[in-house]
Amino acid sequence: RSSDLGESGSGKSTLMNIIGVLDRQTQGNYYLEGQDVNGMSDEVRSAIRNRRIGFVFQNFNLLPRANALKNVMVPLLYGEEHSKNGKEHAMEMLKMVGMEDRADHRPNELSGGQKQRVAIARAMINDPAIILADEPTGALDSKTGHMVMDLFHKLHEEQGKTIVLITHSQELAQETERIVTLLDGQIVADNGGEH
């Protein structure tokens, strides 16, 4: 578990977009699971984004007209696993985050914490190597935010997921093993995993 810490404009979103294979870096190399990502075609990069990276956003980015189950299944539409096994797998993901009883609820029928848990289930559906969480507790109250962070800790400890938390909150960053601090697009501090 690591966090990229910095104020607005520090470069956190740019770094997230590079790690998430949304943007290309202008210099240096980026290796994901031993592969140089920069030299890959857009088609291969898109497949990597879908299969190896899960995204969790502050504002959830759920489809308003789709229920929780269908929201979790969205990444499967772009992959190889479709309807039959996909529905069962999506229910497993909802169960993992404690939301199986809300599978038929639309986002407007869910609390902020419930929406974020659905978003985490969606991020996990393709068994990604990395979960990028951009201010995942920013729209939540303190108690619900701690519940979401506990879920990230569990995913890291029990499933070995790499969680990269993008935040401006020093308090939230302290809950991670490694803190990388950005300022004006530069890394100004990296605790290397030691607090």
Report each predicted region and the residues it spans:
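H-loop (His-switch) and adjacent beta-strand-loop-beta switch element
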Residues: I179-G192
